[in-house]
């Protein structure tokens, strides 16, 4: 006997230090052989020293982070075409897209929970965020989330994702909802 829902994380599929830890294969097995429902989050990291990062370079995982106070990555620029931050985010999405596409080809739906708990400690300006994706506040976060959604569905044709929004604090979650 197995639980109905099992959680996975696509954090290791990224352009910095990514390695194949067989997450996708385990998701497919869970959905096809055990008739389970996979849920997947995405703890995507950024270089701690983004200013000196060259797009496409590999970076040791210890020099990467998801914490907003450990990086100079400017989240507000991640939604502005032509910036290095935007190009980095688009590269991470491209790297990610290969994995849910394989799961889609296997006929398995995924509950996908990207950019979760962005607001952190109940505010809308990003000052209490736990993750870089919430660092620039609710309005930037919503655009970043929609950028991911649009790119995966329209550019990469991924339609097996059931999109889950996950906030931390109910009192501010309506302001952060994409």
Q: Whereabouts are the PLM-identified features?
A:
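A short, well-structured beta->alpha microelement
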Residues: 1, 169-170
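Short, solvent-exposed polar/charged micro-motifs at secondary-structure junctions
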Residues: 50-51, 173-175
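Short His-Asn-centered micro-motif
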Residues: 8-9, 41, 113-115, 164-168
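Aromatic- and acid-rich polysaccharide-binding/catalytic face
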Residues: 6, 174-178
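Flexible loop/turn segments at secondary-structure boundaries
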Residues: 14-15, 171-173
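N-terminal regions that are enriched for targeting/export leaders
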Residues: 1-13
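Substrate-binding cleft of extracellular glycoside hydrolase catalytic domains
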Residues: 15-18, 23-154, 158
């Amino acid at each position: 006997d197995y639980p109905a829902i099992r959680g996975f994380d696509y954090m290791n599929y990224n352009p910095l230090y990514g390695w194949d830890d067989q997450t996708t294969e385990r998701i497919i097995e869970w959905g096809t052989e055990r008739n389970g429902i996979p849920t997947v989050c995405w703890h995507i990291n950024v270089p701690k020293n983004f200013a000196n990062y060259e797009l496409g370079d590999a970076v040791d995982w210890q020099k990467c982070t998801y914490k907003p106070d450990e990086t100079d990555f400017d989240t507000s620029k991640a939604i502005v075409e032509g910036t290095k931050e935007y190009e980095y985010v688009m590269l991470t999405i491209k790297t990610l897209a290969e994995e849910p596409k394989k799961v889609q080809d296997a006929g398995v739906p995924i509950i996908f929970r990207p950019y979760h708990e962005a607001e952190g400690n109940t505010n809308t300006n990003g000052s209490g965020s736990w993750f870089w994706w919430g660092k620039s506040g609710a309005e930037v976060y919503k655009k970043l989330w929609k950028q991911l959604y649009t790119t995966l569905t329209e550019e990469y044709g991924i339609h097996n994702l059931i999109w889950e929004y996950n906030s931390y604090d109910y009192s501010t979650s309506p302001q952060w909802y994409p």
